[in-house]
Amino acid sequence: MNPRFKKLKILGWMMIALFSLSFTVYINGYRLNTSTSFPPGIYVIDAVKDVYQTQDLILFCPPNNNSVKTALARGYISQGRCKSQTTPMIKRVAAIYGDKVTLSDTISINNHELTNTTIKYQDSLKRSLIPFSLNGKSQFTVPYQQVFVYSEHAPSNSFDSRYFGPVPTNNIHGTVKSVLLIADVQAFIDALR
């Protein structure tokens, strides 16, 4: 057998094996988070629920609205398979149906201000950012079958419900938990040195 052909054959089988492994991992609910809203790493879909609660960490598709389209065009979020043409996001549920949200200088839920959640009106390139409002109001009650999400990991820089609004629960893929975080791998490598 020609040595060049043999190398191509091995490479082909390696590609098939890599694709098969990736597909198997994906269908079993494992997802790679590369954003900075939550620590980069591997997460797994833990549970799909009928009702989500505050503090649930969820994987979801953001709403298909102008705020999300603008964020995609500006490169805040990546293109993907959601109806909004974005990749799914990982965020924490901060408010659920019936909770009162106020978006003024910061995010407040039921009159309790969330730490470090300053609402920005310009991005780093001085382009306008418009906070979400429901029917023109910056104080609203989370509608039925929707949740309000944010990131406590990076609260001041997160593109979340303060800009794109509540997320319909049918956009939620499920709760997630971390399996392997990049910081954990780095700490392990540092410990070996």
Residue spans for each PLM region:
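Soluble "head" domains of membrane/secretory-pathway proteins
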Residues: R4-K7, I27-R193
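Hydrophobic membrane-insertion alpha-helices, especially the h-region
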Residues: L8-Y26
